[in-house]
Design a protein with these regions (language model features):
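Flexible glycine/proline-enriched surface loops and loop-helix/loop-strand junctions
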Residues: 120, 217-220, 259-260, 310-314, ...
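Glycine-rich phosphate/diphosphate-binding loops that line cofactor/substrate pockets in enzymes
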Residues: 135-152, 207-216, 306, 327-341, ...
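Short beta-alpha connecting loops at secondary-structure transitions
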Residues: 258-266, 503-510, 520-531
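N-terminal export/assembly segments and adjacent metallocofactor-ligating motifs
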Residues: 2-287, 299, 313-314, 322, ...
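Long, contiguous, secondary-structure-rich segments that constitute the structural scaffold
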Residues: 528, 532, 537-583, 653-669, ...
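Acidic/polar loop patches that form or flank catalytic/metal-binding clefts of enzymes
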Residues: 180, 289-290, 326-327, 340-342, ...
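N-terminal leader/propeptide and maturation segments of large enzyme subunits in energy/redox metabolism
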Residues: 117-133, 287-323, 528-600, 662-664, ...
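Extended redox/cofactor-interaction regions of prokaryotic respiratory oxidoreductases
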Residues: 2, 166-237, 242-249, 272-276, ...
Length: 764
């Protein structure tokens, strides 16, 4: 059902954001507070007189952090979204992206009805069809693929908050082990595998840093304040305000580097050398926590011998830092231990040797005695709730994701019903990683180790996500069938055979959000309004496909409410009870070593922190990290660095009207001396060409002293070629187009993408 377009200008957006912040600064909170408190304070509410205000609970989907939100709607229209004060992540606050959620929902460019392709792949020519036609056609194509090649010939890519239904539930019921999420091999897998090798525990989606009591933090290439995860931004701001020491290692003076006590403008690709020198200082000057390591770690003697040559003087020549800077920062960390941490970071797939770099970071944290200590790193704990009572899936644990559940990682490789393992090379191309989404492209082209003939892309802009775009396009041309499920007509949608338009988070129920955390919790998502146009929720699509494919035994539930209540009954709750509890169920955690009463929480083979890794040694890898040099930029080229912007998420939000108004296109950060040499000034349009001849669209120069002379930087997600996106199409330049090369991490399967170089072209 169509709704009246919601008219919100930037001025009204900022005004309503301030009003929401004022309301949520109050100490009291109940199911009806946000509006009533604002009314009591005499603050204007432009929508207040339109009708009865309805309050519902959800989790935000404007970035992967999924903060709890309180949604206000009037007469079937969402008018305001605020952070849920009961939610451990949002704590009553939202970033600009979260506040702009209604603008995303009411984007007039949204997909409105199911479609089937009528033109050539990539032309974007479709006809609108009924849901019955689209689902019947999709089911028939999947049946044909399964009968001819087996269920494993269907790959499922999933991202955003609803990916559970396709990349987990459907993929496992159908029987394909080839489900993958970019949050793993294109983002976090090196940190997860390194943490598991070192501590026996992955990091988890929420980095377990005990910010409230932290006295010294180190950020290596982590752009807090630009990456703008709500909770982390709050935590950092509070820690910084109370005087915590901040060390930032980054080739660029990022926003957070500008707040640091020490900024180390390191040469890109040399971070591991710096961390090894820190270890050298901590051990050589006996600054480490001896009692902690004696009780909880193994391999100290091997580590000491290994790092003896890696002096600050050795690292200084490699990193372009001074030996004194390296010593002083190591001593600063030690001075504040154990309330001293190198924050793991999130996007860590950089150079292809990233698991070993992350291992070195975790070794420093162990030397500081930080893990399991107040003010250091706490133990994440998953909330308890039972799965929906379905029969055993045809395949289990196939999709990867941001991280495994802490303490629950399995050494077993998922297998399909035919006994075939994943086609991405897990346990053969790379040692430990659960998935490598980018490695599923090759079987689509070559059929090795077996053919992948169909792709389901849920919420993944395939062309703006996976490195080596020409290879991805080649794969999409060869596939027999592509299904795109999305809210917007992103670039890859033009390549689909069937397009299914999804309802947004304000229009649907979704799977429960279970969060491993210091205080583990469960959050709900319920619809605030009816879906716009002819859109449907993912759970409904999956169920309808399952019934058409003979998978009825997995879909005994008829509604999302029935499914969710069947899960919640295992903890004595229900959807109605969750509503009464402000949409969140909080459980008890065990964050510190003292909570384990002398028992080891470390799930390595030795039940201790393994500074020296026997598993890596046995597999033929360095058991203690070493520095591996990366390639230098060719003459006339710069290393291409990329990152985030506080009002945008990946390539998802560039078309959102309010956020587009705040930041419409990216810029090229170029060292001002280099700009002068090239005769360039701020605002000049240039083009970039990489080492393989791939060329970007035009991008404006930002000449600045805030970046090294050997690198350039741009925000990811721009330069989209999607005519259906009236605001984002053709704005800025795409970093993904320039990432034709990547290096596979042989341990985690992560794709190191910072090995690309670009030259600047002033005219084309």
């Amino acid at each position: 059902m169509a709704r009246t377009k919601l008219q919100i200008t930037r001025r009204r957006f900022l005004k309503s954001t301030l009003l929401g912040a004022a309301a949520l600064s109050l100490n009291s909170f109940s199911a009806r507070p946000l509006v009533s408190e604002l009314q009591r304070m005499g603050l204007p509410l432009p929508w207040y007189r339109r009708g009865q205000i309805k309050v519902t609970y959800s989790t935000c989907d404007m970035c992967p952090w999924r903060c709890g939100v309180v949604v206000q709607s009037v007469n079937g229209q969402v008018v305001k979204v605020d952070g849920n004060p009961a939610d451990p992540k949002s704590r009553g606050m939202l970033c600009a992206r979260g506040q702009a959620g209604p603008s995303f929902m009411y984007d007039p460019d949204r997909l409105r009805s199911p479609m089937i392709r009528t033109g050539e792949r990539g032309e974007g020519k479709f006809k609108e069809v009924t849901w019955e036609e689209a689902l019947d056609y999709t089911a028939e194509k999947l049946k044909q693929t399964g009968q001819a090649f087996g269920p494993e010939a269907v790959a499922v890519f999933g991202h955003t908050a609803g990916d559970f239904w396709f990349a987990d539930y459907f993929a496992q019921a159908w029987g394909t082990p080839n489900a993958a999420k970019p949050a793993s091999s294109l983002c976090t897998s090196p940190r997860e595998e390194a943490a598991t090798l070192t501590y026996g525990l992955p990091v988890g989606g929420h980095e377990p840093v005990d910010w409230d009591q932290l006295n010294c933090l180190v950020l290596i290439g982590s752009h807090i304040g630009e990456d703008s995860r709500n909770t982390v931004m709050q935590d950092f701001a509070n820690a910084w305000a109370r005087g915590a020491k901040v060390i930032v290692v980054d080739p660029r003076l990022s926003n957070v580097a500008a707040k640091a006590d020490t900024w180390l403008p390191i040469k890109p690709g040399t971070d591991t050398a710096l961390v090894l020198a820190w270890i050298n200082v901590l051990i050589g000057e006996e600054l480490y926590d001896k009692a902690y390591l004696a009780e909880w770690a193994t391999g100290l003697s091997e580590l000491a011998a290994h790092v003896a040559p890696f002096t600050p003087e050795w690292a200084a020549e490699i990193t372009d830092l001074t030996a004194d800077q390296i010593r002083q920062t190591a001593r600063m960390m030690a001075e504040h231990r154990p309330q001293s941490v190198i924050v793991p970071g999130r996007h860590v797939t950089w150079y292809g040797n990233d698991t070993q770099r992350m291992r070195a970071i975790y070794i420093v944290n162990a030397l500081l005695g930080a893990y399991g200590r107040e003010g250091g790193i706490y133990f994440n704990k998953s909330p308890y709730i039972e799965s929906y009572p379905h029969p055993p899936f045809a395949v289990t644990g196939s999709s990867g994701g941001c991280s495994a559940e802490p303490g629950q990682e399995s050494d077993e490789l998922p297998l399909g019903p035919s006994g075939k393992a994943r086609a991405d090379g897990a346990r053969s191309k790379f040692l430990r990683g659960a998935t490598a989404l980018q490695e599923l492209i090759e079987p689509m082209i070559t059929g090795d180790p077996y053919p992948i003939k169909a792709l389901i892309a849920y919420g993944v802009n395939v062309l703006n996500t996976i490195p080596n775009r020409p290879r991805t396009i080649e794969a999409m041309k060869k596939l027999d069938f592509i299904l795109a499920v999305d809210v917007l007509p992103q670039e890859h949608v033009a390549w689909a055979d069937v397009v299914l338009p999804e309802a947004t988070i304000y229009e649907r129920y979704d799977e429960l959000w279970t969060v491993a955390h210091k205080t583990p919790y469960i959050a709900m998502r319920e619809p605030a309004v009816e879906p716009l146009y002819d859109t449907k929720p993912a759970w409904w699509m999956v169920r309808e496909l399952g019934l058409r494919l003979g998978l009825e035994k997995y879909f005994k539930w008829e509604t999302a409410e029935e499914y969710l209540d069947a899960r919640l009954v295992s903890i004595g709750s229900s959807l109605e009870k969750m509503r009464q509890e402000n949409g969140v169920i909080i459980q008890n955690g065990k964050p510190y070593l003292a909570d384990f009463e002398g028992k080891s929480p470390f799930a390595t083979h030795s039940q201790k922190i393994e500074l020296y890794s026997p598993e890596l040694a046995e597999a033929g890898f360095d058991p203690i990290p070493v520095y591996e040099p990366t390639d230098e930029p060719p003459a006339g080229h710069y290393r291409l660095l990329y990152g985030r912007h506080p009002v945008h998420t990946f390539a998802k939000t560039q078309n959102t009207p309010l956020l587009h108004d705040l930041y419409a296109e990216n810029e090229l950060w170029l060292n001002e001396a280099e700009a002068t040499t090239q005769g360039l000034a701020n605002g000049d349009a240039v083009w970039l060409e990489n080492q393989d001849g791939a060329r970007s669209g035009p991008i404006k120069v930002k000449a600045t002293p805030r970046i090294r002379a050997d690198a350039v930087y741009m925000v990811h997600g721009f330069g989209q070629e999607a005519p259906g996106l009236s605001r984002a199409n053709g704005r800025g330049a795409s970093d993904t187009k320039l990432q034709t090369a990547y290096k596979l991490d042989p341990i985690s399967g992560g794709a190191g993408m910072r090995i690309n170089f670009v030259r600047i072209i002033k005219e084309v």
